[in-house]
Regions:
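Short, conserved recognition motifs on repeat-domain binding surfaces
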Residues: 1-286
Length: 286
């Protein structure tokens, strides 16, 4: 197996849900982009994909969000699907969990789920846990709009909540907050219009590790394990910012498309043998 930087330039009707062990979870939309018509796991290195049956909660008029995880205890992949009323960003209605080995979905009790989640922000997987951001219905608080970190234990199928550090501004519209992997641990990226903060979890508290004086709002791409942060350049292309030296270098002068998903890809032979009871296909087929 070998590792590569992976940039995924998806057509408008495809979304990468997540990536684990050489396998990407991909969701395909119909033209209206509200109802997924296909969910599949894809191994780009061998161009093999396996179709996942749709969760029972998928229906017209609702948005279905997915998260991708791996259970290291049972060596099994799982997908978490959550349903929202179309146009409503935060209020969760139903949750289903797909288990790869069983090829089936089951409902998660809704009272165990947070009522407020931000469906638009990315999810991050690390060491058997899926992380995403929770929402505070009262935005003008010290924590701001994004109030807590939600984690889902893939093995135990249980949710946990961690309060996030206070924001420095209240009610600001130019603010992004999402989980990242930093030094092999979960961390938080706080992006404002003029600067960005990186918070790490240490001894059950949040510690601000870096302040980056760059305009990264809607320009952040990926934080590499070597401490180089990739972001879109002011004139197009992709730049690299080193957290320690603060040096900025041009990685690519221009890109035809902005990557919709970026990660460290590891080649593997997963999905090579296929499954007797599932639709395995070549992707892309051209």
């Amino acid at each position: 197996m070998s590792k590569h930087e992976l940039g995924f330039y998806s057509p408008i009707n495809y979304q990468v849900v997540g990536y684990i062990n050489g396998v990407l979870c991909v969701k395909k939309y119909i033209a209206a982009k509200t109802e997924p018509i296909q969910i599949f796991l894809w191994n780009p290195s061998i161009r093999k994909a396996v179709e996942i049956p749709l969760p029972r909660i998928v229906q017209s008029g609702f948005d279905t969000e997915c998260a991708f995880g791996f259970d290291p205890i049972t060596n099994d992949y799982k997908i978490v699907a959550s349903l929202y009323f179309h146009g409503e960003n935060y209020f969760l209605k139903f949750v289903e969990i797909y288990t790869m080995s069983k090829n089936s979905w089951k409902f998660l009790e809704t009272e165990k789920c947070p009522s407020l989640l931000d469906k638009h922000h990315p999810k991050t997987y690390l060491d058997g846990l899926i992380y995403w951001i929770g929402i505070d219905p009262i935005e003008n608080t010290p924590k701001g709009k994004f109030s807590h970190l939600v984690s889902f234990n893939v093995d135990k199928e249980a949710l946990n909540y961690i309060d996030l550090p206070n924001c420095e501004i209240f009610g600001g519209t130019n603010h992004e907050r999402f989980p990242i992997i930093f030094n092999r641990s979960i961390a938080i990226m706080d992006i404002y219009f003029e600067h960005t903060n990186i918070w790490a979890r240490e001894n059950n508290t949040w510690a601000k590790k870096y302040t980056i004086n760059l305009r990264l709002f809607q320009k952040y791409v990926y934080l590499k394990s070597d401490g180089n942060l990739l972001h879109c350049g002011e004139q197009g292309g992709v730049n690299s910012y080193n957290l320690e030296s603060k040096e900025v270098n041009v990685v690519a002068k221009s890109y035809k498309f902005v990557p919709s998903f970026t990660g460290c890809y590891m080649e593997s032979m997963m999905l090579l043998n296929g499954f007797d009871d599932r639709n395995v296909f070549t992707f892309p087929n051209g």
